[in-house]
């Protein structure tokens, strides 16, 4: 069974709200770098980057981060007959002494974010990393907490939260899927 918990209108309002929060927290946007975790986190990062540009007139540097080889659960993610494919980052941007705005679609156990933090070290030593999560569903296994949250959605472990984006799904919405 599937229930739409965020429709397109709410999706775009959430992007706008998070963008406003980032601007309000940082008077100087010059030291910010936007990092989106591939795949849907990167698309959400692009939406936030464009909204910040629209609101502030400032275009922030950004990269799409592939965390494939930093994961601790590859044997569970990839089929046994298939080797993982690493696509790398979209480009190299140094994050040395910058504030990184790390963006992903869903925060669940925290393991994806841990992998992203490990991958981020390859781009330099950031002054600070702030985490943006579109949907926080709880059930953390690691001590990770988001600085900006689009929506908190309490779930059972058997439920699934699916953030759908235009590039991958042809729409902007969030679905709660019960088994």
Swiss-Prot record:
EC number(s) given by UniProt:
2.4.2.9
Record keywords: Glycosyltransferase, Transcription, Transcription regulation, Transferase
Recorded superkingdom: Bacteria
Q: Name one GO molecular function term.
A: uracil phosphoribosyltransferase activity
Q: Where is this motif: PRPP-binding?
A: 100-112
**One Pfam family here:** Pribosyltran
Give me the reactions it catalyses: UMP + diphosphate = 5-phospho-alpha-D-ribose 1-diphosphate + uracil
Entries under CDD domains matching the protein: PRTases_typeI (cd06223)
Which Gene Ontology BP terms does the record give? regulation of DNA-templated transcription
* Family assignment from sequence similarity: Belongs to the purine/pyrimidine phosphoribosyltransferase family. PyrR subfamily.
Described by its record, this protein's role is as follows: Regulates the transcription of the pyrimidine nucleotide (pyr) operon in response to exogenous pyrimidines. Also displays a weak uracil phosphoribosyltransferase activity which is not physiologically significant.
Q: What is this protein called?
A: Bifunctional protein PyrR
């Amino acid at each position: 069974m599937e229930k739409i918990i965020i429709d397109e209108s709410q999706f775009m309002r959430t992007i706008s709200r998070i963008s406003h929060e980032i601007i309000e927290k940082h008077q100087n946007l010059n030291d910010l770098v936007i990092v989106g975790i591939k795949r849907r986190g990167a698309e959400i990062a692009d939406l936030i980057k464009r909204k910040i540009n629209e609101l502030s007139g400032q275009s922030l540097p950004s990269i799409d981060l592939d965390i494939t080889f930093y994961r601790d659960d590859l044997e569970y993610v990839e089929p046994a007959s298939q080797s993982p494919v690493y696509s790398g980052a979209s480009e190299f941007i140094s994050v040395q002494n910058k504030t990184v705005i790390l963006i992903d679609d869903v925060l669940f156990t925290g393991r994806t974010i841990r992998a992203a933090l490990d991958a981020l070290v390859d781009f330099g030593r950031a002054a600070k990393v702030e985490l943006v999560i579109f949907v926080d569903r709880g059930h953390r296994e690691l001590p990770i907490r988001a600085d900006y949250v689009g929506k908190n959605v309490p779930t059972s472990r058997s439920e699934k939260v699916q953030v759908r984006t235009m590039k991958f799904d042809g729409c902007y919405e969030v679905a709660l899927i019960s088994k």
